Amino acid sequence: MLSGFLAVALSTSACVTSAQVPLEEYTLARAAYEAAKDADAIRYAPSLWYTAEENYREAQRAFKERRYGRAGDLFEDAREAAEKAENAARIARHQAGDS
């Protein structure tokens, strides 16, 4: 999935300046999303996880539709929600003795 998005981004960057394509936002959101997933946020912080997942999927759709400004904003929102979900999950796991 990651390589597919990067291929699309690289192929479209020839048509659009690289400043408009939110590659950094995508990369940071993806890393935060994976970290939250690894922290078992879906179990320990489901509402935050759901927000991160929804923002991430909507950002992917916007990116595919070349709405790069919207995609960048949504990737940032997804990253923030995923980071909160990861932190909340780690705290909840620790409190539950599952760490």
Predicted region positions:
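Bacterial N-terminal signal peptides that target proteins for export
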Residues: M1-G4
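C-terminal motif of bacterial Sec signal peptides marking the signal peptidase cleavage site
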Residues: S11-A14
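Amphipathic, heptad-repeat alpha-helical segments
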Residues: T17-Y56, A96-S99
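Inward-facing hydrophobic residues that define packing positions of alpha-helical scaffold repeats
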Residues: Y33, W49, Y56, F63, ...
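Helix-capping and short linker residues that terminate individual alpha-solenoid repeat units
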Residues: E34-K37, A41, K64, E83-K84, ...
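Amphipathic, hydrophobic secondary-structure cores in small proteins
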Residues: Y44, E58, Y68-R70
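Short, charge-rich amphipathic alpha-helical segments embedded
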Residues: D73, R79-A96
